[in-house]
Amino acid sequence: MRKYTHYHIPVMVREVIEYLKPEDEKIILDCTVGEGGHARAILEHCPGCKLIGIDVDSEVLQIAEKKLKDFSDRVSLFKASYRDADFLLKTLEIEKVDGILLDLGVSTYQLKGENRGFTFEREEPLDMRMDLESEITAQKVLNELSEEELARIIFEYGEEKRYARRIARKIVENRPLNTTLDLVKAVSEALPSHEIRRRKRHFATRTFQAIRIYVNRELENLREFLLNKAEKLLRVGGRIVVISFHSLEDRIVKEAFRNSRKLRILTEKPVRPSEEEVRENPRSRSARLRAAELVEEGGD
């Protein structure tokens, strides 16, 4: 594993515990355990509960294992996609859990660690895979997909409404793209200078988000889990808490909760981080938390 000197600060920890309500003898499924920040807080808060943590990123799991070593008798970590959580629990002979947590988005390690390709701040290979065993990389997507398909991805997943086609055209013109700075260059050539100056965030943020979402099938996985898996994994009275970081994710969560006959929504509007937390951890600014409780058996 690469040398790592950056530490991930979990967002909205107090709110996660408030809505998840971990209790002794209960089992919590942390579907995106990452570096173990939320998991540690849950285990510290509830000395008698157990936690199953899963993540597709084998490197962050190594960090989580070290962070959670004091709770080794109450925590089990696995490399897996939360989309396949039902199969994992079946192999563990666990029928239901009492709480589910999803903290979506990219971890600090993925952003700050070397050669992962998630950042536009320095030159790295165009990777962007959360699961390093996956065959689809950002480089493959950017160099092999058609201009039309790239424009669709940037429009839909990056919410780049006005300039998606121009960006896709510049990507194709600049091929082959091999590094993150190659992609930044293509985006900068596509956007008018006044648009670059106008944007509050880095001008390539939306395009990087779009390619990352596509590479990792983030929205498909979230939709599949919420619509077809989550309710079946929860006991009646169990709770699901989801933290999202952009409107595409939040929309899926909101609609899944509202369209379910078996969930009672606990957060009519998304809960946002406190002003104090945003000051201490600017990354939390865009976080939205939604929670629901299973009130009717979710099936086998």
Curated annotation (Swiss-Prot):
This protein's name: Ribosomal RNA small subunit methyltransferase H
Biological processes annotated in GO: rRNA base methylation
Organism field: Thermotoga neapolitana (strain ATCC 49049 / DSM 4359 / NBRC 107923 / NS-E)
Catalytic activity: cytidine(1402) in 16S rRNA + S-adenosyl-L-methionine = N(4)-methylcytidine(1402) in 16S rRNA + S-adenosyl-L-homocysteine + H(+)
Organism taxonomic ancestry: Bacteria, Thermotogati, Thermotogota, Thermotogae, Thermotogales
Regions crossing the membrane: none
GO cellular component, one term: cytoplasm
Binding site for S-adenosyl-L-methionine: 36-38, 55, 89, 103, 110
Function: Specifically methylates the N4 position of cytidine in position 1402 (C1402) of 16S rRNA.
Keywords for this protein: Cytoplasm, Methyltransferase, rRNA processing, S-adenosyl-L-methionine, Transferase
Recorded name of the encoding gene: rsmH
InterPro entries: RsmH, SAM-dep_MeTrfase_MraW_recog, SAM-dependent_MTases_sf
Compartments reported by the entry: Cytoplasm
Record GO terms (molecular function): rRNA (cytosine-N4-)-methyltransferase activity
Pfam families the UniProt entry points to: Methyltransf_5
Protein's UniProt keywords contain rRNA processing: yes
KW S-adenosyl-L-methionine (keyword) present: yes
EC number(s) on file: 2.1.1.199
Alphabetical list of SUPFAM superfamilies matching this protein: Putative methyltransferase TM0872, insert domain, S-adenosyl-L-methionine-dependent methyltransferases
Coiled coil: none
Recorded family membership: Belongs to the methyltransferase superfamily. RsmH family.
Main EC class the enzyme belongs to: transferase
Family annotation (HAMAP family): 16SrRNA_methyltr_H
